[in-house]
């Protein structure tokens, strides 16, 4: 602990935030790179619907057909459209999420250090809302870059900064926050995923007779995949609505198709029914499940690594405090011994003065 006047600066919280942010960003970047082609396909399915059916007429070839179309029309580079803003967005995304999530859990936990499911959901939702507001512009850019290759008559963005500049110039700040309402509605996803993930980890730790911090990577992978599937299925429709709203401003001088969230939901439901709200869900699960496994497993392992590399400041503070207490104790003991010695010497001198000398042989 570092003291400044009456205020106390908790270095441990800074260390934990840095460790969480570093581990999360590393894990997210690895996962994003691995599953980017599926992310491109999912985004295009959400915005444009199904690709042209293969000539063979076989069913179940949506992903393969989409990949072939992308490679044929845009090359292998097309499979990684939007990767740069995705990775750039993940850095503040995880930094904001885990720092806010950790702080809210500390605030909401009971006096005995336990966190109820309801409090965990509130913490996860609050962190999700803060993250959505902070990073929405980057996700808008990512969506535009992923879909621009298949929009006729669209002047393509040259880079991430080019996309930012043009969106601000042509649509204003509002364009960077298109789709923010369904994004905020999407906090229900993390409000389900994170509490479920932690409960599953606790169950597995209990079954293995170990602590949550010492779970094996395999158990972490299982817990993260189950939690992700549950949350994705329950909350997927908001992703479709968000993608449609984020993408529609890209076509110049085109009539706005959706006036808002409610209008978008109504039109999608009328034209496509419930399946329209789950368009791309299977692809999304194929993308998000391994992504969650990679992200959470890497995150947990990197977090343990960072905690080992950077020992808790509180431990060093405790060591210094114990050393100071030991020195003070030794000093006090020395002072007490000096006082005792002085007292004994004074008593000896007093005895010598007060005791008369009686010569031997006197009567």
UniProtKB/Swiss-Prot annotation:
Keywords: Antiport, Membrane, Mitochondrion, Repeat, Transmembrane, Transmembrane helix, Transport. Residues 315-343 have a biased composition (Basic and acidic residues). Solcar repeats lie at residues 15-107, 115-203, 215-305. Highly expressed in young meristematic shoot area, vascular bundles of leaves, developing siliques including the funiculi, petal veins, developing pollen and central cylinder of roots. Residues 313-363 are annotated as: Disordered. The chain crosses the membrane at residues 21-41, 82-102, 121-141, 176-196, 215-235, 277-299. Pfam families: Mito_carr (PF00153). GO terms for biological process: NAD transport. It is found in: Mitochondrion membrane. One of its GO terms (molecular function) is antiporter activity. It comes from the Eukaryota. Gene3D superfamilies: Mitochondrial carrier domain. Residues 345-354 have a biased composition (Polar residues). Its main location: mitochondrion. Inhibited by pyridoxal 5'-phosphate, bathophenanthroline, tannic acid, mersalyl, mercuric chloride, p-hydroxymercuribenzoate, p-hydroxymercuribenzoate sulfonate, bromocresol purple and N-ethylmaleimide. GO terms for cellular component: mitochondrial membrane. InterPro entries: Mit_carrier (IPR002067), Mitochondrial_sb/sol_carrier (IPR018108), Mt_carrier_dom_sf (IPR023395), SLC25A32-like (IPR044712). The keyword Mitochondrion applies. It is a multi-pass membrane protein. Appears to be a mitochondrial envelope-located membrane protein lacking an N-terminal-located transit peptide. Belongs to the mitochondrial carrier (TC 2.A.29) family. PANTHER family: MITOCHONDRIAL NICOTINAMIDE ADENINE DINUCLEOTIDE TRANSPORTER 1-RELATED-RELATED. Mediates the NAD(+) import into chloroplast. Favors the NAD(+)(in)/ADP or AMP(out) antiport exchange, but is also able to catalyze a low unidirectional transport (uniport) of NAD(+). This is Nicotinamide adenine dinucleotide transporter 2, mitochondrial. It comes from Arabidopsis thaliana.
